[in-house]
Amino acid sequence: MHIERVDTFAEFQCLRTAWDTIYQSDPEAQFFLSWQWLAGALESYPGEWLVLVARGADSTYRGFLPLRRKTIWSKSRQQLRNELQFAGRLFWADYGGVLCLPEHEEAVLNAFAVYLKQLHWSHFYLKGFRISDRRFELFMAPFADERFIVEPMTSTINDGETDNLVSPHIDLPDTFDAYLAEKLSSNTRQKLRRFLRKLEVSTEYQLTTTNAATQVRDVQILETLWGKLRREQKGANTQRLATKYGMIVQRGLEDKTCHLLILWYRDTPLGVLASFVDWDKSRLLFFVSGRDEDFRELPVGLILHACNVRWAIEHGIRTYDFLRGNEPYKYSLGATDMRLRYPLVRTQSGVNPNGKLDPGCIDEALQLAVDFAKRNYTQRAVIACQQILATMPGDEVAQRLLDALVDVSEVRGRQ
């Protein structure tokens, strides 16, 4: 098995046909490993990712592992280091994983892990790893090495009340009536039917689905309602986070992978719910929502999810995926759990092997060195330049900056 590294979007685009073929063939493939999802993330963040490509002896494609790379200054070790995550995290994907042909999974997973051990990184965060027990053992086995430490991590929110390594989902029946009868309690079923009837006969309430003509407006509504709902929790970061959600959903709408519902009262939007559609795997994935909490006449969130479930069933979708988080409302709608994994693989030293950086991060490392120099963190800037030169000997920009920093230090030393 031969492993290649791809780190430009042009190269990634050339993989689409093979990627789609393997995606359709892999029973463990999930939407956040699809070419379309990753295309949005990778194109939006050039220079921050790499994709490992597995090819057989006959050069046919056997598997893909998309990764995000970050460059971090370690305060404790006083040097730059690299971290790896699943690349889907660039677009806040809830799941990560490995894509491979099932008949070659053992060779592919082993080859990816062995290749990763040769790269320069200190921490590999496999957050939201969605993978079978069999594949997990195959992938993790090579990291049982004295150079590495493997730690199981947790992921909770809401003061520990919500476990983000639990992923509730609903296996959908053939009809919405069957869903109401089989998946809901009698109390929830009666309440939902009552509110849906009210919605259907009302001239003041309406439910709309985003189309090309309303796309810009509807994404703005999402950002506004999400921000209003989360402002107390997110504080100064609210607008930045809302804008990124809008960017991700906008890309999905352009790619025709996003289904966006809005519930209105007259001309006022009450709530919005954005989901991604995986037609290949027959799955609708709830991604983000917003609502006006001041409106109390209807349970806006419940109605939006119920209408989303109905839309999924009417379009032949077999699974409604709530993604991460075991919030109680998901179970009131008939969800059952799937468990995700979150191992951290890190080097014993806590830094990159031999202090060298991943070659793909040189531009990022140079920017950090320049920033350190501007802020008079001279020693940090010197160390960063030295690491860059250890990785890429002869790099002219790093050498010039290092020479300038040394000259400044000598002048200060004589004063």
Model-derived regions, located:
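A conserved beta-strand-loop-helix scaffold within acyl/acetyltransferase catalytic domains
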Residues: 3-83, 128-145, 151-296, 403-408
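Acyl-donor binding region in acyl/amide transferases
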Residues: 49, 55, 72-160, 281-337, ...
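Active-site/acyl-donor-binding loops of N-acyltransferases
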Residues: 140-177, 319-372, 403-410
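Short, charge-rich amphipathic alpha-helical segments embedded
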Residues: 387-411
